[in-house]
Amino acid sequence: MLIIPAIDLKDGKCVRLKQGRMEDDTVFSDDPVATAQHWVNEGARRLHLVDLNGAFAGTPIHKPVVEAIAKAQPELPIQIGGGIRSLETIEHYLEAGVTFVIIGTKAVQEPEFVEEACKRFAGHIIVGIDAMNGMVATDGWANVTDVKATDLAKRFADAGVSSIVYTDIARDGMMQGVNVEQTVNLAQYSGLPVIASGGVTNLDDVRNLKGQPGILGAITGRAIYEGTLNLREAQLLLDENRL
């Protein structure tokens, strides 16, 4: 299991939001490339990048920044989400050195797109499911749908998806702990590996996720930036008595 640092990009800066609200941001760095290097130095084995402006615009806004990070970290698996709505965008990111591309809103609006992407780019597609009270949210969390997160995950069980990034919006950026029950339930219901996101605050949250069936990793943002979680300590904890 991996602890994956999040680098959320807004207006060229590395920020953290609370519950996805663009107006409620905290800027942690003006240099995302240096931030990525910092987390690699701290032992990161994968990076989670989010183009926040892209998520709202429906098209990538931070391509040059993402490309620069990928170029600086050629050996490191990198996943990117936010504004990915076309096969051309996926191809561009993969050619630039990104390892995994996360499809979110488009997966809800057009599930067939995910299936086509998995055929074209096998092993490189992650579905991002963001949920409020178990219901899927889209367009940078601006719209909550009537689609259950578990049903959407199940829809892609046989599509060739690499994994699912599951974000509990109510917990995201709030430092209130991860929703272990919902995350594990999603993994068991879909049969797909799940990366937990939203609410990972301290080592207790990491312990609660460790060894849970179907959990591939956990994304953490505000906690490692504000110091309530030490990335290296968290990964060491997960590496102990690895199952």
Swiss-Prot record:
Pfam family, one: His_biosynth
Catalytic activity: 1-(5-phospho-beta-D-ribosyl)-5-[(5-phospho-beta-D-ribosylamino)methylideneamino]imidazole-4-carboxamide = 5-[(5-phospho-1-deoxy-D-ribulos-1-ylimino)methylamino]-1-(5-phospho-beta-D-ribosyl)imidazole-4-carboxamide
Keyword terms of this UniProt record: Amino-acid biosynthesis, Cytoplasm, Histidine biosynthesis, Isomerase
Gene3D superfamilies in the record: Aldolase class I
Keyword Cytoplasm: yes
Gene Ontology cellular component annotations, sorted alphabetically: cytoplasm
CDD domains in UniProt: HisA
UniProt xrefs under SUPFAM superfamilies: Ribulose-phoshate binding barrel
Pathway where it operates: Amino-acid biosynthesis; L-histidine biosynthesis; L-histidine from 5-phospho-alpha-D-ribose 1-diphosphate: step 4/9
Subcellular localization(s) per the UniProt record: Cytoplasm
Active site: 8, 130
Enzyme Commission number(s): 5.3.1.16
A GO BP annotation: L-tryptophan biosynthetic process
Main localization of the protein described in the UniProt heading: cytoplasm
Recorded GO MF terms: 1-(5-phosphoribosyl)-5-[(5-phosphoribosylamino)methylideneamino]imidazole-4-carboxamide isomerase activity
Keyword field contains Manganese: no
Protein name: 1-(5-phosphoribosyl)-5-[(5-phosphoribosylamino)methylideneamino] imidazole-4-carboxamide isomerase
Native organism: Acinetobacter baumannii (strain ATCC 17978 / DSM 105126 / CIP 53.77 / LMG 1025 / NCDC KC755 / 5377)
Lineage: Bacteria, Pseudomonadati, Pseudomonadota, Gammaproteobacteria, Moraxellales
